[in-house]
Amino acid sequence: MAGILFIISAPSGSGKSTLVSELRKQVSGVDFSVSWTTRAPRGSEAHGREYNFASREEFERMIEAGVFLEYAEVFGSYYGTARQSLLDARAAGHDLLLDIDVQGAAQVRARMPEAVSIFVMPPNPRVLRTRLRNRSRAEGVVNEEEVYRRLNEASKEIENYREYGYILVNDILDRAVAQLEAIVLAERFYRNGESIAYRSRRVLEVAAACLQSNSRERLNPVLEAFGVLGSNGQQQLNFGQDSDEEDSNDDSEDDNDD
């Protein structure tokens, strides 16, 4: 069975790392490519688990050596995917999941147009701001300038949603995990004829509902909230002025995600 290459992208704080972790608990045969980065480890992150950490000089030597399938600079740090991850997954007959930003995803799609691409959106700027603030608190400091910068960057990244085949809105974790699982199983069914047994019809329906081409009505409130759908065609950011007390009441189970 030929493995499938899945790309998953999302603004920082959208919860994609949690989604990927939950998916791998429930679906076998999905390898995860541990990205390389030059940013400093956060909290309990360990080399080789969440990321492979390298100095900027080491990373640039790896670029020159052709180590990476894709790489990009995001928020002042390099991130990249080693080609070896894809070779190892193919040798094992496994699917491979790449957790990469929109720049890296564009590079991979250009080289491998058969890849399945998935974009994860936060439900609105207020929830995203809460997650980013809570992550900053967990690191010992709340940097409002950095939070606002990432909110602005999120709107820019969301503008790229049309480049992805599937769209998830991570408002309810269990539902988003079920949707991600359905996408993987449906793609296996369509591409490899892999059986999904009695769940087949429901799985295919859930996956189809997440297709970007079928998601416009569902996505409009999110796009409007992030200013991607301005009435005059201009980006209209609406991050709100909610207090910290209101922020603390938001769902924060994905606070530590990139």
Task: Cite the ranges covered by each PLM segment.
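NTP-dependent small-molecule kinase module
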Residues: 156-258
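ATP-dependent small-molecule kinase phosphotransfer cores
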Residues: 37-96, 102-106
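Pre-Walker A (Motif I) flank of P-loop NTPase domains
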Residues: 1-6, 93-94
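A glycine- and Lys/Arg-enriched "phosphate-lid" helix/loop adjacent to the NTP-binding pocket
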Residues: 39, 43, 90-95, 107-162, ...
